C-alpha cells in the first residue's frame, strides 16, 4: 500500500464492495484489509483504487476506515438487465457488487428493449447519492433467450472468444516441419502409435498416451507437448497465450486456451 505524509495518514488500496452496502479496502502487502461502513463508502465503485483513512478499531478488532478520495476507476463496462421506463432506462448489473443501477438516458439505449441483457459502457460513476450513468454498446439477447445467460458470463469476465487473424496465421505456419535442431537432445518416438483422450471439439491437443509391450509387460507412455518450442517469445502467439492461461469450460461451450 501507499501512505501519504501529513497529520492523517492516507492509505491507498482497492475497494471491494459487499452487496449489503459496506465494503473493504484491500492494501497490497498487508494481510488485513480495512472495513468500510456503508456511510463511509462515499460513492466508491467496486474495483476502484481509493484513498482511505483509519477511523478506529473498535474492541481491538478489524480496522475501520473512511474513503476520502477515489484515485481511479477500474471498471469500464458492466453486463446487466435493461429495464425501460418512459423516456429513459436502467441497467441492473448482474454482479451484485455493483450496488447501484445504471441510468441510461434517452438515445443511449442502442435500441434495447425491456428484458434485454446488455453491455453498458460507463460514462459517469455518479456521486454518493446519484446513480452511475452509461450508454449501451452491445445487446446480448433477451433474458429468456437460450444461451443468453452463458454469453452474459463471457461478456462480464471479458473472456476472449475469437483469435486475432495475425495469431491464426502464425499458428498455421508453426510446427509443420521438425528440424534437426528440434530433434537435438530429444528421444524420437514418432513411430509409436499414440492417442489423445479429448472430445471431438477439443482444440488444445497437448497430451497423449501410448501402450507398448516391454519384456512381456505393458509400458504406459504419457506424452506432453513442449509447446514453448514452437512459440517465439513476444510473438503474436506468445502475447495471445498470455491472455489465455487456461481453457474456460462453460455449460454449453469451451473457450480454448
Q: Residue spans of the language-model regions?
A:
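Charge-lined substrate channels and their catalytic hotspots, especially those that engage the 3′ end
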Residues: 1-221, 228-257
Amino acid at each position: 500500500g501507499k501512505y501519504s505524509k501529513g497529520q492523517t495518514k492516507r492509505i491507498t488500496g482497492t475497494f471491494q464492495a459487499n452487496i449489503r452496502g459496506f465494503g473493504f479496502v484491500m492494501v497490497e502487502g498487508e494481510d488485513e484489509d480495512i472495513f468500510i461502513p456503508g456511510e463511509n463508502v462515499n460513492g466508491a465503485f467496486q474495483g476502484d483504487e481509493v484513498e482511505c483513512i483509519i477511523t478506529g478499531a473498535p474492541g481491538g478488532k478489524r480496522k475501520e476506515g473512511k474513503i476520502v478520495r477515489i484515485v481511479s476507476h477500474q471498471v469500464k463496462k458492466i453486463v446487466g438487465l435493461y429495464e425501460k421506463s418512459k423516456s429513459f432506462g436502467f441497467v441492473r448489473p448482474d454482479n451484485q457488487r455493483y450496488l447501484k443501477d445504471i441510468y441510461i438516458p434517452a438515445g443511449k439505449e442502442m435500441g434495447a428493449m425491456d428484458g434485454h441483457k446488455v453491455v453498458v459502457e460507463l460514462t459517469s460513476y455518479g456521486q454518493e447519492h446519484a446513480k452511475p450513468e452509461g450508454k449501451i454498446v452491445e445487446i446480448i439477447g433477451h433474458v429468456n433467450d437460450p444461451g443468453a445467460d452463458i454469453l452474459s458470463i463471457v461478456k462480464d469476465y471479458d473472456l476472449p472468444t475469437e483469435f486475432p487473424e495475425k495469431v491464426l496465421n502464425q499458428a498455421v505456419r508453426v510446427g509443420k516441419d521438425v528440424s534437426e535442431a528440434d530433434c537435438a537432445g530429444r528421444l524420437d518416438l514418432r513411430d509409436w502409435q499414440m492417442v489423445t483422450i479429448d472430445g471431438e471439439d477439443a482444440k488444445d491437443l497437448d497430451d497423449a498416451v501410448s501402450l507398448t509391450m516391454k519384456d512381456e509387460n505393458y509400458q504406459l507412455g504419457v506424452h506432453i507437448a513442449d509447446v514453448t518450442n514452437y512459440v517465439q517469445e513476444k510473438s503474436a502467439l506468445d502475447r495471445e497465450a498470455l491472455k489465455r492461461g487456461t481453457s474456460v469450460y462453460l455449460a454449453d461451450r469451451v473457450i480454448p486456451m
